[in-house]
């Protein structure tokens, strides 16, 4: 059983300004990057292959292919560094984790799109 004070503090940290997305969705994540004294927004677009944890510790992993090399990036969902998340496309999947997509390329890596 969790402490009520901890739950109260965590509830104030949760962000609700993001759209609902699932594993299998293609998303575009806008991340704030600080380089030197400047800050800019970098967009990372790819397939959500996993979602883990709950509450303030919730994370999701996005995979994309960049110049022929697969890149996985894990984001904390409630991080202040994430400025926006856009759902580009929703796909039909039957698994909670899509780690098998790491071994697929070309036509075998296709997923069936669903309308939401």
Curated annotation (Swiss-Prot):
It comes from Mycoplasmopsis agalactiae (strain NCTC 10123 / CIP 59.7 / PG2) (Mycoplasma agalactiae). NCBIfam families: rplS_bact (TIGR01024). Coiled coil: none annotated. This protein is located at the 30S-50S ribosomal subunit interface and may play a role in the structure and function of the aminoacyl-tRNA binding site. It comes from the Bacteria. InterPro entries: Ribosomal_bL19, Ribosomal_bL19_CS, Ribosomal_bL19_sf, Translation_prot_SH3-like_sf. One of its GO terms (molecular function) is structural constituent of ribosome. One of its GO terms (cellular component) is cytosolic large ribosomal subunit. PANTHER family: LARGE RIBOSOMAL SUBUNIT PROTEIN BL19M, RIBOSOMAL PROTEIN L19. Belongs to the bacterial ribosomal protein bL19 family. SUPFAM superfamilies: Translation proteins SH3-like domain. This is Large ribosomal subunit protein bL19. Keywords: Ribonucleoprotein, Ribosomal protein. The keyword Ribonucleoprotein applies. One of its GO terms (biological process) is translation. The keyword Disulfide bond does not apply.
